[in-house]
Amino acid sequence: MKHEMMNIKPRCITIFFLLFALLLGNYVVQASRPRSIENTVSLLPQVHLLNSRRRHMIGSTAPTCTYNECRGCRYKCRAEQVPVEGNDPINSAYHYRCVCHR
């Protein structure tokens, strides 16, 4: 009986330290990137304003403009969404066109 108790103690201690190490590791990982709710909430209106100023890109990435498409531009040239039908831009399909910017 006494021999069994001596066997159980090291096992319990080992399990205890293993769980403690896992919990401590989890705490350290989560604490390395602190996120407060107040900062996240205060950034939401700013993100919404930036997104509402321009239309969202169709697809995941905008195409890159070639040298020939930007040949006449003096400054910056980038791909933008342009409605196919200019009369009804909301219900129209969009395609990309390279536009010169100043």
From Swiss-Prot:
The loop (82-95) connecting the two anti-parallel beta-strands (76-81 and 96-101) confers the function to the peptide. GO terms for cellular component: apoplast. Disruption phenotype: Reduced stomatal densities in various organs. This is EPIDERMAL PATTERNING FACTOR-like protein 9. Transmembrane segments: none annotated. Changing residue 70 to S: Incorrect disulfide bonds formation and loss of activity. Unstructured protein and loss of activity. Changing residue 77 to S: Incorrect disulfide bonds formation and loss of activity. Unstructured protein and loss of activity. GO terms for molecular function: protein kinase binding; receptor serine/threonine kinase binding; signaling receptor binding. Changing residue 85 to A: No effect on conformation, but decreased activity. Disulfide bonds join 65-98, 70-77, 73-100. The gene is EPFL9. Residues 1-31 form the signal peptide.
